Amino acid sequence: MLRAVLLPTLLAFGAFTPVHGANSPGCGKQPTLTNGVNQINGREYVLKIPDGYDPSKPHHLIFGLHWRGGNMYNVVNGDSIQPWYGLEARAQGSAIFVAPNGLNAGWANTNGEDVAFIDAIMEQVEDDLCVDQASRFATGFSWGGGMSYALACARAAEFRAVSVLSGGLISGCDGGNDPIAYLGIHGINDPVLPLDGGVTLANTFVSNNGCQPTDIGQPASGSGGSVRTDFSGCSHPVSFIAYDGGHDGAPLGVGSSLAPDATWEFFMAA
């Protein structure tokens, strides 16, 4: 077992309070942004507005972040993963999706430049489209997972929840003191970013969210299964899923619903 350590915390957080809660400035407007590649500050992202978009209806805003050596199209097209990490199919038109493109095929986030990029995308999208500002989410695999963690650290007040797939401390953690709903999903035999590193990331929010310390459950190697640990006593939910596998953008295989279902359900319950 890997111990999920409850680090000392200075504040006892109360009941969960949603971030923001206002509708974005784009609500009620006819959009000018279109599906496909858009630009902001010299960088690119792919935008997916749902079919039948209603500008009077607030939508979830979900960022899908690519892995090292990948790009935004890998997330959109579902290269070695389900498209949009399987979340677009589950959203059924309730969400606007964004796949940003990293610099040099990654998310080094030097001096916070990638967090600033996400900030700029959010502002551009929300000025034009109708977003529920209490319903922003981020997910990603590997370096995309590390970047999702960096957003949880630096933008806990702006995002409702993140789902970190096989992530590590590779995009920094500016801040990292505030609570946010956090889901970690990690292979027990990950040779690239080992499991204990994923547990360490989760422990940041075990502490921030005032959770009780809990042992992380693990499946037997070779079982093809997974074990979920839900922490208790948290102001914002924290869960961790250890699965029998390695460094995988699609845990238990592209056809598996493990990560898409867990992520979507976690986001909607956060």
UniProtKB/Swiss-Prot annotation:
Could you tell me how activity relates to pH for this protein?
Optimum pH is 6.1.
Q: Name one GO molecular function term.
A: feruloyl esterase activity
Q: Which reaction does it catalyse?
A: feruloyl-polysaccharide + H2O = ferulate + polysaccharide
Gene3D superfamilies in UniProt: alpha/beta hydrolase
Q: What induces it?
A: Induced during growth on suberin.
Q: Tell me what this protein is called.
A: Feruloyl esterase C
Going by the UniProt record, its keywords in alphabetical order are: Carbohydrate metabolism, Hydrolase, Polysaccharide degradation, Secreted, Serine esterase, Signal, Xylan degradation
